[in-house]
Structure formats: C-alpha cells, structure tokens
Amino acid sequence: QIQCPTGRIEPVDTYTDKLLRKIYRSDTFEGLSSEQVIIGFLMNPSYWGNIPFIRQTNKELPQAYSLPEGKYIRFFDVFSEDGSYLISDAVDKAYSRPAAERSRLEKDLLKLDEKINILYSLQQGKMFALFPLPGDTSGKWYSPGDDLSVYSGKDSLFVSKIMPWYLGEASDALRTGTWESAGEVLSMMNVYQQKQSATPLLTEKQVSWELFYNKARLFFWSAMGYMAVGLLL
C-alpha cells in the first residue's frame, strides 16, 4: 500500500491509476497497466524518458516553446542536453500572472509543467510514499527519495535499501519471467508497513474491493467508448 499526497492510504494500483490519468489521460498505456508504467518509469527512467506518453493537446504549444508536434511528448523533450528545463522561464512568467489573466496557452503550459514535475519527482524517488515512520503519530509516510535521516538503526537500513532491491528484482523478473523474488521483497514491505504504521492499513478485503472497483471503472469507460464509436458508424 502507499500514502497519496492527501494522506490517504490506498492500493498502489489506485495511486498509479491517478498518476497515469493525470499524465496520459488513461488508466493504461499500450496494453500496460498504470502500475506497470509507473514502476517501469522508476526502474528505467532513461527508457521511459524517450517514450511519448505525456499528453498535451494545445496545437500552439509546440511552436511557442520549441516542442515536438503532436498530442504526446517525451519527458526528455523539455530538457536540453545539459539538463536545463527548457520551459522554465515561460512557466515562471505564467505563474507570475494572476490566474484569471492567464491565456489558454499559458494554462496548458502549466498543465504540462505539472505532468513533468510529477515524472521528475518520481525519477528523484519522491511522490511514492511507502514507509511509515516508527512512533510517528502524525501518520506521515516517506518516499525513498525523501530525507530519511528521521529513521534510525535497522529501520534506516531497511527504508534506504528495500526499494532499490525491489526494482532490481523486478528488472530481473522482466527478463526471466520469474517474479517470486520480487514478490518476496514486496511482502517484506507489507510486513514493515503493518508493523510500523500509526494509520490503519486497508484490509485484504478492502484492497480487493478497491481493485475490483478500479477495473470495473476502466471497463465501464472502455464500453462507453466503444458505444460512442458504434453510434458514429
């Protein structure tokens, strides 16, 4: 399970669905689930940085900010070879203007900036809060890329090593087709969460129902899409 920015504890699947919908406007990408896409980005940001899956639909935006044409751009499209953020000045200028006075182009630029910031945060190990802090009654969980100096002893070692370990096992599993070791690492995370979280975790039944709801919602919107296409034919 994971803690979303609002503080809710929820299945990773629910959280990654929200992230991918924000970035790509869909729960799936070319047959991959949201969880596969987001975990894939964590595993191999260099690969996913070259995949055009960041949606933007303003036709003026590419020409205005020297970006590729089309509805989707790559993460690396907004960075120069030296790592500079190419739309930084334009974003700052848009934010300096009162919201009511921003043009449609500026509003869409800020939407793109939000999507890029989500992916950048994930690349830095943030926005993926998996670790409760022992004895912390505030209920805050921490991401692998956060300042983990608040942990001590064995807890410090665990939270700093477990995610790289899992991503390594998942990478191996993609090549071998054997997910047993990756599953064991996930089980270790779950045990840690159950033991250390001051906030009650979802029960297995609650998780199952939420996953069912996620898939049912996806099926509903897919069916509506097919129905709309049928009406047009």
Language model feature labels by segment:
Residues E204-L233:
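Core alpha-helical transmembrane segments of integral membrane proteins
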